[in-house]
Amino acid sequence: MSGNDLTNDRVQAHETLIGVGNVATLKPAWTFKTLGSVSATPLVTGGYVYFPDWGGGLHKLNARTGQVAWSRKVSEYTGWRDSVSRTTPVLSDGILVVGQQPQSFGAKHDSSYLPGPETGDFLWKVMLDQHPATIQSQSPVVYNGVIYIGTSSNEEHWALDTKFQCCSFVASMAAVELKTGRVIWQTPMVPKGYTGGAIWSSTPAVDPKRGVVYITTGNNYTTPPEVAECGERQARLPACQ
């Protein structure tokens, strides 16, 4: 998974070969021509590398040789021409979980979709938000048969169009059943009357002992009028919090 494990520590404790003394001497073992730039952290497991690119591709390569096991377009799974993924896939119980987003203005919404890792064949997809600006930029995590993933938005970019009526998107965090795609729960990230609160970064951290999922949010768009008015009167004072 993107953060290495459930704690999202991003530490490879078993890596002993690469260090400050030899990193400058490293040379490519193999290369692979993608359909676009790659910004997602690759998933490396079972001798294979899984990753998406900004050209709309999703790939599985042999980690040692770079040989292509399979390479698909994200649009094959979603049915939407401009679909891309910027999230690190996660593999659990023989199922590959990937989040996606549209590239074009006014395109379709977010969804999580699941290819089978051996062939890349489609299994199921789930749409977590009907808002047209919704995307998924957070990489999912799977624990105990449940996918944890949040929603983000392109609405602040859409607002560059002066004709666009911003803002109405409300972010949420969801728990989805891995085998079926059934949404177990979904929680909004901002109180009623607010908009924004996108979950756009990294991967959730899961604490199995406490039964808690840790996430970060950002990009608040709007606040209720009474809160905004209070803020103007009492700028930076606790009275408005």
What are these regions (language model features)?
Residues 18-21, 53-69, 73-74:
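Beta-propeller domains
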Residues 23-24, 62-65, 116-119, 177-180:
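Short loop/turn segments that connect beta-strands within beta-propeller blades
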Residues 27-29, 67-71, 121-125, 184-185:
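A structural motif specific to WD40 beta-propellers
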Residues 73-80, 126-131, 183-197:
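Surface-exposed loop and turn segments in beta-propeller and other repeat-based domains
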Residues 1-28:
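Blade/loop signatures of beta-propeller domains
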Residues 1-6, 35-57, 80-112, 132-165, ...:
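Repeat-blade elements of multi-bladed beta-propeller folds
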Residues 33, 62-65, 73, 127, ...:
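Short clusters of small/polar residues that mark proteolytic maturation junctions
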Residues 10-14, 55, 62-63, 226:
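Short, glycine/acidic-enriched capping/hinge loops at junctions between secondary-structure elements
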